[in-house]
């Protein structure tokens, strides 16, 4: 019904045929790079390319520059804070392919968050994770929202996540309804 397409449009990955999409006061796709973090539903990693959790997260910092920058101490400190907050600090030097699906999802969330985005786009962030991990991730998203980050997520698990959300926007066959969850 267009949920992923909407997220990818706000990210600037889908060409807008008519009208404009604005993120943080900037028109998407017009040469500007708004401060957006993105966690796709199914992340693709070349499993023949052995990268550690630390390396994957620090790749998020490099997304804004054309070359791989050497991570600064502040980047490493922020990375460790994110990994600890997401409950995966012990896996810092672990190859990502050795993690469970839920742990990998949290690594990709940390990669998006290390950019300190003003808008965080998440495509099915709670799919394939256990109930405790789902609740931990949702509590983190609520905290981020309180800190001024706009969080936009798509989900098929509306009943599971609605209790954590201040506002819900539902798209069903082109019809949009929004408001506080009831």
PLM features per residue range, with description:
Residues 58, 72-91:
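Conserved ABC ATPase "signature" region
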Residues 11:
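Helix-to-loop junction immediately C-terminal to a conserved catalytic motif
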